[in-house]
Amino acid sequence: MPLVPLAIPPGVYRNGTDYQSSGRWRDASLIRWTEGTMQPIGGWVTRATVSSNKKVRGSIAWSDNSADRWMAAGTYEKLFAISASNTVTDITPTSFTTGDESAALNLGYGGGFYGDYTYGTPRQDVVNYTEATTWSLDTWGEYLIACSNKDGKIYEWQLNVAADALVITNAPTSNLGIVVTEERFLFALGAGGNARKVQWSDREDNTTWTPAATNEAGDLELQTSGQIMLGIKARGQTLILTDLDAHAATYQGPPFVYGFERVGSACGAISRRCAAAVDRGVFWMGSRGFFAFAGGQVQDVPCEVSDYVFNNISASQRSKVHAVTNAKFNEIWWFYPSAASNECDSYVVFNYEENHWAIGTLARTSGVDAGVFANPVWFGTTGIAYNHESGFNLSSETVFAESGPFEIGAGDTTMMASMLIPDEKTRGQVSVTFKT
């Protein structure tokens, strides 16, 4: 009885028709490929309940100067500090303005004022989009820096669990986010309500924001038609992404302090948390593709599942898209709301070392990688923090991989398959189904 090898390359191919994925994996969930071997992802266990039934939309982990470990997590109405012993402390500033748990889209009828325009004449496209409230979190030394896109104020928390986070003195308000540069400047993004403005504090002093001959504070309005979405540290630079393009900020010293250069067009960010930095550069999701920046110019990242992802995403809830790294497996995960959901219930994963993709379903709203803590910590839709890559318990989720069609020979021979010899790392029972 002859054996016919089915050499299926790692990763999922989900572009085009089923037939175009011949000889490839067509669908999967909770499956990864590592060094050519297919296996389930690691399991997860509950770590802490951060906020009952409130979605975390921003998180960070860090160690303070005494080597104590912390996490911070923000919802649309609260900001929390989480100790290494999983004690959750509400550090919400007293002046914080509650935001929006979900995005809202108002278009067409009711989007304008009664009596505007003349009957039968064309109108401009009327779309009012309110984003879901998300948090931009970073550290200033051992202290937490936080800003929500709805509230717009910049806060600092100095590790005192008996005190709330406080507004940073003299910092601009009505901001869209923050990032702390490698040179220790605090950038306010969309500063003062100007969606294209970057304003920075003096070096090592986040309370000095007015430029003077004796400091390095400053500001600049980006030459772009878009609005700033996020800032993220890149190697030797700070990358600023708008919803249309990308700009790199490079420290130059006085008198200009920072120089800004557009490094990519038509590569805007889909959301304020869609970018992740790894050794190979910064990767992010756009509205119809994926991009990377490792110095020089932005590069497109070819994606073998882009048709599936972007035809399946909820455009109205795109502001909830977020990226999480899993460095142990050289992965970047993007969680997104599917077209049938208001919450992040699906994901797409890129293995940036082996250059392949995976897809699946899993509801997570934010997360931090391992490093500060032993395991990645990802947050579920009910406000629970989970230790991931821990054991083999995948709850009630279904783990599977489905291939595209196979042709034996030229497809002109009828064969009867009586046995399949798998080559994969198995955790428990595995069932196989043939489709004809």
Regions found by a protein language model. Give the residues of each.
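Structural signal for beta-propeller blades
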Residues: L79-F80, G152-I154, A195, A246-H247, ...
